[in-house]
Amino acid sequence: MKEIEKLKEEYPLLNKLIATEEVFWVNPNMEKYETAIKDSPLNEENVKDAEERLKRFAPYIAKVFPETKETNGIIESPLVKIPSMKQALEKNYEQPILGELLLKCDSHLPISGSIKARGGIYEVLKHAEQLALQYGMLTEEDDYSILDSDTCREFFATYSIAVGSTGNLGLSIGIMSAKLGFNVTVHMSADAKQWKKDLLRSKGVNVIEYEADYSKAVEEGRRQADADPSCYFVDDENSHDLFLGYAVAASRLQKQLEELEIVVDEEHPLFVYLPCGVGGGPGGVAFGLKLLYKDNVHCFFAEPTHSPCMLLGLMTGLHDKIAVQDIGIDNVTDADGLAVGRPSGFVGKTIEPFLSGNYTVSDEELYRLLKELADTEKIYLEPSALAGMIGPVKVCAEDEYLQKQQLTEKMKKGTHIVWGTGGSMVPEDVMNGYYKKGLELIL
């Protein structure tokens, strides 16, 4: 394929990407915040709107999901310091990590146990609100817990929701939609874990399985919705609502950092490492963080060596016009949540001027990191959620990047946040298998 040869000449890093080697890519198209935000299709108002909507729904969430009672129906996760893991990383990789290391435990988000509880649940709630307002079931001034009634469930049962997923988005959309009363179908790709399918079916969700990858599952979900006017399709590749649901995480994180007395400013940079599949979750979170911290936050996406779709799309500038399969990469990885061959064009183009860089990590490395985190901090994440954990090691080793960004002298006063995207709902026997694999790879 001649085009690929041309791309290889233009982007030499592509050779390593094709060889599924671990790479670190600095985004040459990143702009200063004030420039980037001018051309952005989304802004602060959009994120505020999403935040307000989640507040309106909080009484309903607290009522139907008792695990959110303590937080009054706000779906949020802990931010924890992980000093023992930091020491282990420094020792294992022989690389000092300057600054403090924290883990954002979206793995322990209530309801669906992953970052997808942010965007997925938000989009379903927004759709439910629109229908309920349109048909006079609700006004914005109401206590939204009135939606927990047979009348409302019967009303929502006349509508359906569809989504294509590798697993975690399906869990959040499926659980939330079924709770409201919608008929919900999750189209799942070949790499979706069995326990995720079983859990969804136990909640009354219709699960359709495919032998093909994520893109096919999304395509089929879209087709189902197109054929049925009462069916709403959650489009993980193009959804602004999902993106905004994730972006709300930033203001929540800001409060947590303030509670921990962690300063973020020009002298105290913040580095955030986000596992990336199709791009919605990390894209939304990164966008929200840039709105708050502007040029003082540096966001990096992390992808499996066998599914580096966003890195490929950003580096070549082709976005969703190129898939990893086009350059001979198989898109087969144990990091099921990140097993995506073609990135979201909407996310890639939106986040491009805000993103600091992107790197890849091997499955073997994910398992080793999984075991290490379990041993040092007693925190258990699923393999894909560990993709961010190697980020601080990689960034601290990038002297050229740090000097160029005038960060070298500031690193000691900086903060690194690894976004732990999922894991608390993994069945014990499955998690034990992951741990064992990590152990075998270390021995």
UniProtKB/Swiss-Prot annotation:
It is an enzyme of class 4 (lyase). Keywords: Lyase, Pyridoxal phosphate. SUPFAM superfamilies: Tryptophan synthase beta subunit-like PLP-dependent enzymes. Pfam families: PALP. Its cofactor is pyridoxal 5'-phosphate. PROSITE patterns: DEHYDRATASE_SER_THR. NCBIfam families: D_Ser_am_lyase (TIGR02035), PRK02991.1 (NF002823). Belongs to the serine/threonine dehydratase family. DsdA subfamily. It catalyses: D-serine = pyruvate + NH4(+). GO terms for molecular function: D-serine ammonia-lyase activity; hydro-lyase activity; pyridoxal phosphate binding. Its EC number is 4.3.1.18. One of its GO terms (biological process) is D-serine catabolic process. This is Probable D-serine dehydratase. The modification N6-(pyridoxal phosphate)lysine is found at residue 116.
